A protein has these predicted regions:
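Small-molecule kinase domains that catalyze NTP-dependent phosphoryl transfer to phosphate-bearing small molecules
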Residues: 96, 125-126, 147, 151-200
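ATP-binding Walker
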Residues: 12
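ATP-dependent small-molecule kinase phosphotransfer cores
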Residues: 37-108
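Walker A/P-loop
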Residues: 15
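ATP-dependent NMP and nucleoside kinases share a basic, alpha-helical "lid"
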Residues: 97-106, 111-148
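Hydrophobic anchor at the beta1->P-loop junction of P-loop NTPases
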Residues: 6
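Short beta-strand-centered segment that lines the nucleotide-binding/catalytic pocket of NTP-utilizing
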Residues: 27-40
Length: 200
């Protein structure tokens, strides 16, 4: 079983790639964001550490962490965001490692795909056989983000500027998937990558 990391900047179409993968191979797709939601739930591994750090003011109904309140605190304060990430990210990675081990024992899958915005920063190369960079040119990304999220060009530029550059992604990833054309072109490219791995 191969573990493949999926990463790329905002608007590169990572979700579209993730959605097509289960039709192309026997796989499981793990999204780090969804795992983060899980570990932050009441009774889960990150809950107490987050409440201790940010106080019970962040709790909403049923004493669950209110992600909106927490978001308002951390996204205007880099220091607090770094603290939150230092709590959540290692726990997410641990939970993902556990899932991988579980699936390896079951032996039913050929691939596990892990998608995380900070895949490289959080050193997922330690648990991945390969990391794929989902690439799309700026104009494609811009159109997607205007359409899907209603963002202004100025806002899009400021988000992209904060993220890893295309050169850095290309340098640090093993494979590049060009997602700037049609969905069918992307699909063909992924099929080819999967076949290459299976024939190794």
């Amino acid at each position: 079983m191969q573990v493949i990391g999926i990463t790329g900047g905002i608007g590169c179409g990572k979700s579209a790639v993730l959605n097509m993968l289960p039709d192309l191979c026997k796989c499981m797709v793990i999204e780090a964001d969804k795992v983060a939601h899980e570990v932050m739930k009441k009774g889960q591994i990150a809950y107490e550490a987050i409440v201790k750090e940010f106080s019970t003011d962040i709790l909403g109904k049923e004493k669950e962490i209110d992600r909106k309140i927490l978001g308002n605190i951390v996204f205007s304060n880099e220091e607090k965001l770094a603290v939150l990430n230092s709590i959540v990210h290692p726990m997410v990675k641990t939970r993902i490692k556990e899932s991988i081990e579980e699936k390896k024992k079951e032996g039913l899958l050929d691939f596990i795909f892990i998608e995380a915005a900070l895949l490289l920063e959080d050193h997922y190369e330690e648990i991945c056989n390969e990391i794929w960079y989902i690439y799309a040119p700026f104009d494609s990304r811009k159109q997607r983000l205007i359409k899907a999220r209603g963002l202004s060009e100025e806002k899009i530029l400021s988000i992209i500027k904060e993220q890893r550059s295309e050169e850095q992604f290309r340098r640090d990833c093993d494979k590049v998937v060009d997602n700037g054309g049609s969905i069918e072109d992307t699909r063909k490219e992924i099929v080819k990558l999967l076949e290459n791995i299976e024939h190794q």
